[in-house]
């Protein structure tokens, strides 16, 4: 069964169509109007080996908040739907990713229990037309809409771009790990019998 899904969401603030193929090869086609965010989503797809298409139009004349958060909502919904009943997936994933002087850890659990721990000092307030505080909002939106327990921690680093880039790469790698199928797992990876 294909593990892919497409979601469309239209509000008074944004109009988004997103599709993801969990078993892809890292191809992406991203257009949100927020250049730095597009770059980060491309990195997430490439390093997670997901095929990801995102078309978003938002109220960027105000700021990037609605666009970034709503893409996170839709990405979370697409991940959840693409995984279906989560049969035979490894469930847990983690990744340490260095980017020059920065080192980031992402650990996650596809538990169905949404939670975010985000621990990072982002010294630069804006990269391109994106406020760096929106990175946490994005991860929160993904986690809560996909049902992921997600921990994102910058262990150290001084360059905000490097820290955030390492976060998106590590998130892709950790999610790839957690979504991999393992033939040894019968049903789901839980003694409860469901996730």
From Swiss-Prot:
GO molecular function, one term: imidazoleglycerol-phosphate dehydratase activity
Pathway listed: Amino-acid biosynthesis; L-histidine biosynthesis; L-histidine from 5-phospho-alpha-D-ribose 1-diphosphate: step 6/9
SUPFAM superfamilies assigned: Ribosomal protein S5 domain 2-like
Presence of the UniProt keyword Phosphoprotein in the record: no
InterPro entries named in the record: IGPD_sf (IPR038494), ImidazoleglycerolP_deHydtase (IPR000807), ImidazoleglycerP_deHydtase_CS (IPR020565), Ribosomal_Su5_D2-typ_SF (IPR020568)
Localization of this protein: Cytoplasm
Protein name, as recorded: Imidazoleglycerol-phosphate dehydratase
Organism: Acetivibrio thermocellus (strain ATCC 27405 / DSM 1237 / JCM 9322 / NBRC 103400 / NCIMB 10682 / NRRL B-4536 / VPI 7372) (Clostridium thermocellum)
Gene that encodes it: hisB
């Amino acid at each position: 069964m294909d593990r892919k899904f497409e979601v469309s969401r239209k509000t008074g603030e944004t109009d988004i169509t997103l599709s993801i193929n969990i078993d892809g090869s890292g191809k992406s086609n991203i257009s949100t109007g927020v250049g730095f965010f597009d770059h980060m989503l491309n990195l997430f797809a490439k390093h997670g080996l997901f095929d990801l298409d995102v078309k978003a139009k938002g109220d960027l004349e105000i700021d990037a908040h609605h666009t970034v958060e709503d893409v996170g909502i839709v990405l979370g919904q697409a991940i959840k739907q693409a995984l279906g009943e989560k049969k035979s997936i490894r469930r847990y994933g983690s990744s340490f990713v260095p980017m020059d002087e920065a080192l980031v850890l992402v650990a996650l659990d596809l538990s169905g229990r949404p939670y975010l721990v985000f621990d990072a000092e982002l010294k630069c307030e804006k990269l391109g037309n994106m406020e760096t505080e929106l990175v946490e909002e994005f991860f929160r939106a993904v986690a809560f809409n996909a049902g992921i327990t997600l921990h994102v921690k910058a262990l150290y680093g001084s360059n905000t771009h490097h820290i955030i880039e390492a976060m998106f790469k590590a998130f892709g790698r950790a999610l790839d790990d957690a979504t991999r199928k393992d033939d040894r797992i019968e049903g789901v990876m839980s003694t409860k019998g469901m996730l």
